[in-house]
Each structure stands twice: as structure tokens, then as C-alpha cells.
Amino acid sequence: MSKPTREEATEAVRTLLKFIGEDPTREGLLKTPDRVINSYTEIFSGYGKDVEEILNTKFYDTCNFQDFISLEGIKFTSFCEHHMLPFNGTVHIAYIPDNCIVGISKLARIVNIFAKRLQIQEKMTVQIAESVQENLKPLGVAVKIAALHSCMSMRGVMQDHSIMNTMHYTGIFAEQQKYRHEFLNLTTKR
């Protein structure tokens, strides 16, 4: 499959405007197709980013730190791959290092990479956890995502306050309940 040109994408937006009964040549909509393409270029910029590159800078002189490291409250907005409607929420990540750590901002960058793609929350949860596990090789990783989905609030069942929670664990978090419990206690308070 070849990538459409910018002109083809812009024309597709014009076609959608016509489909919903709008006139793409009226004054208020003249620049809308181009604005939509500019927005989508930014919103879906995660496709052009490499997680391995983000996690490439590791710190090995960590004073043998082998306790829980967590970053809580990472805000994100993504788009569901089923309806192309936004879902937004919060990600909590924890890991227990083995021989290296990563700058804490890198964890937020990973969330941004996966959020800026068409997604389902379940897959995004696994992608974040597994990418940290594969690149840092910690003793374990825990990820929890809590999100509101526009596909449930703007259409269908019209539930605008329902929050979906997903969790994924690797290593010691998957194997030992005490670590999961500590992680969930920490993230439930938020």
C-alpha cells in the first residue's frame, strides 16, 4: 500500500465534508481540509518515532538501585482505531531496574509515541510495558491506563463518565502479587 499524497488526503477531507452534507467551498470550510491534514500530521506523529531510539540512553551507575521506580499521571490523548474518535486519560508506569535506569522523561515520551497512533487501549497498555521490558531489561514492569472514550460518550451508549482501566505486568510484577498490590495501591490514590 502506497502512502497517498498530501493533495489526495486533502481531497479525501473535502469528500467527507460533502458526505456529511457540507459545502467545502463555503467560506468557513475553505481551509478546513488543509487544517485537518496539518492536525492529523501532528496527532498521528507516533508512526514516525522509534521507541528503541528514545530508550537508547541508559544510566548504569545507579548505586545498585533495585527498588520500585514509578512515573504517575502521564496525561495522553489518542484516537481509537475503530471509530477514529479520541480517548484520553492517564498512564502510570513502574519498573524495578536490574542494572540500568532511564531518564524519567523517556517514559512519558514512550507514552506519547504510542498515543499518537490509531490505538485501542488494551494494545497501548501492552506496547508501553513490553517496550520498557525489551529495552531496559528490568526485573519487571507495570503499566496502568485509565481513560475516557469518546466512542462511548459521543455515540452508541452515550456514557460520558465511564472510565476504562487496563493493566499489564511483566517479570516480577506478573509473578509476585505483592509488587502488583504495591503498584495498584500507589496508582489508585491518583
UniProtKB/Swiss-Prot annotation:
Catalysed reactions listed for this entry: GTP + H2O = 7,8-dihydroneopterin 3'-triphosphate + formate + H(+)
Pfam short name (any one): GTP_cyclohydroI
GO annotation, biological process: one-carbon metabolic process; tetrahydrobiopterin biosynthetic process; tetrahydrofolate biosynthetic process
Keyword match Nucleotide-binding: yes
Similarity remark: Belongs to the GTP cyclohydrolase I family.
Protein name per its UniProtKB record: GTP cyclohydrolase 1
Biological source species: Rickettsia akari (strain Hartford)
Keywords, sorted A to Z: GTP-binding, Hydrolase, Metal-binding, Nucleotide-binding, One-carbon metabolism, Zinc
GO MF term set: GTP binding; GTP cyclohydrolase I activity; zinc ion binding
List of residues binding Zn(2+): 80, 83, 151
